[in-house]
Amino acid sequence: MNLIKQFEQEQIKKLTQGKSIPNFRPGDTVKVNLRIIEGANERIQAYQGVVIARANRSISSSFTVRKISHGQGIERKFMLYSPLISSIELIKQGVVRRAKLYYLRNLQGRKAKIREKIFSKDNQ
């Protein structure tokens, strides 16, 4: 068992080399830049939304991002250490009291808004 954990830690170091993964939690707004490969073409596509869940499972860690597009809620699950993710940016931090925000699926408009963590200039 210890050998498997050691191997996973080595793989995580390889996959995060040259990448900075911010420390984000459910309720935070993030922008995930994905590499999309279509035939011979490769491009970067941004996906911005609220993190509604995070699963910390070593190399299999994942997180779910929800956004509203054209009035329709869209959720996408990302593997944290995927080589297809070029970068993750933390846009703003939210204040929530739950680890899983699945209840946001049933809310619309202002009710689905998450309070934002305010930083004073002294604390920055």
Curated annotation (Swiss-Prot):
Job of this protein: This protein is located at the 30S-50S ribosomal subunit interface and may play a role in the structure and function of the aminoacyl-tRNA binding site.
NCBIfam families in the cross-refs: rplS_bact (TIGR01024)
BP GO annotations: translation
GO cellular component: cytosolic large ribosomal subunit
GO terms for MF: structural constituent of ribosome
UniProt source species: Orientia tsutsugamushi (strain Ikeda)
Keyword terms: Ribonucleoprotein, Ribosomal protein
Name listed for the protein in its UniProt record: Large ribosomal subunit protein bL19
GN (gene name): rplS
InterPro entries (alphabetical): Ribosomal_bL19 (IPR001857), Ribosomal_bL19_CS (IPR018257), Ribosomal_bL19_sf (IPR038657), Translation_prot_SH3-like_sf (IPR008991)
Family per record: Belongs to the bacterial ribosomal protein bL19 family.
